């Protein structure tokens, strides 16, 4: 058993992350909602095992499946840049239970302005925690920047939600009014994520060569990574928030369903959860987490950084550099 366990490299992915299918398998494994209920002590125990294995100390011997489970706990709960235990609500493994409750509420209670304001406030508070938790941690963000990002995103979501609601209530069908929550979520993501990670855009994020050696700080890499995260987050929410209103529009016309109106909110919440179980790993897998950037683009848009690269590599600039884009 000991010989088997020594063959396990805890830093080597169990899936092929160069393909969408491999990334989907990895994120379905890593964002498993069941890991949310694992205690902090057990998570720290998993981290200790991973750190021992990295140092070459693979005792006591464990079965491969036990090692893999500890790797799963470690990857789901600890930040890839700092190794710190992530905020409970900010972990991607909490996206299904947290997202289903909040999205279900937004879809079920969209008819009045106070309800829209309440649920958008809750949603943006949750998003702020998720965005901060899954940032590139090598670019620190001040409390002031966090506050500005939170207030700006919440305001943009409310403006989009109330604006769409007031406009569509007069000119659109009841079906289109059901899409108000998605319009607000999409608008807020374009504001929340860049502002929450504005320090990365201002100062750049660490980029590495093929050997994992830091070769500079690139603002262009930050913009690319954050842009991909925005697309992923909107894609994560889109199916549930666009398909579910169509389903509910049909169901609410049925006499049988009208007699059990109390089931509306829990039913929508459950359906959103079903969508998210599939969409969380799908959205995370759209782009590689360890993103890359062609250095020829850096030469055009970041000439100073490219000159530094030439000096550090003695003219042998790598074709691509790599960085953690966050989730």
Curated annotation (Swiss-Prot):
Localization: Mitochondrion membrane
Cysteine-cysteine disulfides: none
Membrane topology designation: Multi-pass membrane protein
Molecular function GO terms recorded: L-serine transmembrane transporter activity; monoatomic ion transmembrane transporter activity; transmembrane transporter activity
GO biological process, one term: serine import into mitochondrion
Database matches in Pfam families: SFXNs
Record keywords, A-Z: Amino-acid transport, Membrane, Mitochondrion, Transmembrane, Transmembrane helix, Transport
Coiled-coil region list: none
GO cellular component: mitochondrial inner membrane; mitochondrion
Family in the record: Belongs to the sideroflexin family.
PANTHER family, per database record: SIDEROFLEXIN, SIDEROFLEXIN-2
Function comment: Mitochondrial amino-acid transporter that mediates transport of serine into mitochondria.
Name of this protein: Sideroflexin-2
């Amino acid at each position: 058993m000991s010989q088997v366990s020594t063959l396990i490299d805890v830093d080597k992915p169990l899936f092929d992350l160069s393909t969408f299918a491999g990334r989907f398998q990895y994120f379905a494994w890593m964002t498993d909602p069941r890991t949310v209920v694992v205690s902090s002590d057990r998570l720290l125990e998993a981290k200790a095992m991973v750190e021992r294995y990295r140092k070459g100390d693979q005792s006591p011997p464990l079965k491969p499946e036990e090692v893999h489970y500890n790797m799963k706990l470690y990857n789901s709960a600890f930040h890839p840049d700092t190794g710190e235990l992530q905020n409970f609500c900010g972990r991607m493994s909490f996206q299904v239970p947290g997202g289903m409750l909040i999205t279900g509420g937004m879809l079920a209670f969209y008819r009045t302005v106070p309800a829209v304001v309440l649920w958008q406030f809750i949603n943006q508070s949750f998003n702020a925690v998720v965005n901060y938790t899954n940032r590139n941690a090598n670019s620190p963000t001040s409390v002031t920047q966090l506050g500005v990002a939170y207030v700006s995103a919440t305001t943009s979501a409310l403006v989009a939600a109330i604006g769409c609601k007031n406009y569509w209530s007069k000119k659109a069908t009841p079906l289109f009014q059901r899409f108000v929550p998605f319009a607000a979520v999409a608008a807020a993501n374009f504001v929340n994520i860049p502002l929450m990670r504005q320090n990365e855009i201002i100062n750049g994020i660490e980029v590495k060569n093929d050997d994992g050696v830091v070769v500079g700080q690139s603002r262009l890499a930050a913009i690319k990574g954050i842009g991909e995260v925005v697309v992923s987050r909107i894609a994560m929410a889109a199916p549930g928030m666009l398909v579910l209103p169509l389903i509910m529009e049909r169901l609410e016309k049925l006499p049988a369903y009208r007699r059990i109106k109390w089931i509306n909110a829990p039913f929508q919440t459950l359906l959103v959860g079903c969508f998210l179980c599939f969409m969380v790993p799908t959205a995370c897998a759209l782009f590689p987490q360890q993103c890359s950037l062609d250095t020829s683009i850096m030469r055009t848009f970041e000439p100073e950084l490219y000159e530094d690269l030439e000096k550090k590599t003695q003219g042998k600039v790598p074709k691509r550099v790599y960085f953690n884009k966050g989730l």
